[in-house]
């Protein structure tokens, strides 16, 4: 019988073979769709600890969301799928709809500055560009005469 130290040497080989099996066998999408709801259920249970009116404040639940993300990644990798993939993304989008559909982003309404400010901001660079181009042309003509 092998000692624990001898079994420990077999661990990298076992991990290598298991990892290769998932890649060789391909993505088990059915298994992934069966496993991902576990992550969603765990996330829902964690989100119950957060007041509903704080669900739009990422700093209130970022640890739970990280755990959810890690769970979905681990579950997809276990069944031999890459992460992210379209099925996992659609599952995550469903979770977003369930918890964050009422979160809206307040868009800033931009306005142009008053004309007294806008005209100089446009005119000064244009005039400087014309003046510099004129200076270059004048200087190049003057150099041609000296040579």
UniProtKB/Swiss-Prot annotation:
Cellular compartments per GO CC: adrenomedullin receptor complex; amylin receptor complex 3; cell surface; lysosome; plasma membrane; receptor complex
Signal peptide: 1-22
Site (Required for CALCRL interaction): 112, 140
Domain of life: Eukaryota
Disulphide-bridged cysteine pairs: 39-71, 56-103
Key words of the record: Cell membrane, Disulfide bond, Glycoprotein, Membrane, Receptor, Signal, Transmembrane, Transmembrane helix, Transport
InterPro entries the UniProt entry points to: RAMP, RAMP_sf
Function: Accessory protein that interacts with and modulates the function of G-protein coupled receptors including calcitonin gene-related peptide type 1 receptor (CALCRL), calcitonin receptor (CALCR) and G-protein coupled estrogen receptor 1 (GPER1). Required for the transport of CALCRL and GPER1 receptors to the plasma membrane. Plays a role in cardioprotection by reducing cardiac hypertrophy and perivascular fibrosis in a GPER1-dependent manner. Together with CALCRL, form a receptor complex for adrenomedullin/ADM and intermedin/ADM2. Together with CALCR, act as a receptor complex for amylin/IAPP.
Similarity section: Belongs to the RAMP family.
Name of the featured protein: Receptor activity-modifying protein 3
Protein species of origin: Rattus norvegicus
GN (gene name): Ramp3
């Amino acid at each position: 019988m092998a000692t624990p130290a001898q079994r420990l040497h077999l661990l990298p080989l076992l991990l290598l073979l298991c990892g290769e099996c998932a890649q060789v066998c391909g993505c088990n999408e059915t298994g992934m769709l069966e496993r991902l709801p576990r992550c969603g259920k765990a996330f829902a249970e964690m989100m119950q600890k957060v007041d509903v009116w704080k669900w739009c404040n990422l700093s209130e639940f970022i640890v739970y969301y990280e755990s959810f993300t890690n769970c979905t990644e681990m579950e997809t990798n276990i069944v031999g799928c890459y992460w992210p993939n379209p099925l996992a993304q659609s599952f995550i989008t469903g979770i977003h709809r369930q918890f964050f559909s009422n979160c809206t982003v307040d868009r800033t309404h931009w306005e142009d500055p008053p004309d007294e400010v806008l005209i100089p901001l446009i005119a000064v660079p244009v005039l400087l560009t014309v003046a510099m181009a004129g200076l270059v042309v004048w200087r190049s003509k003057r150099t041609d005469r000296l040579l």
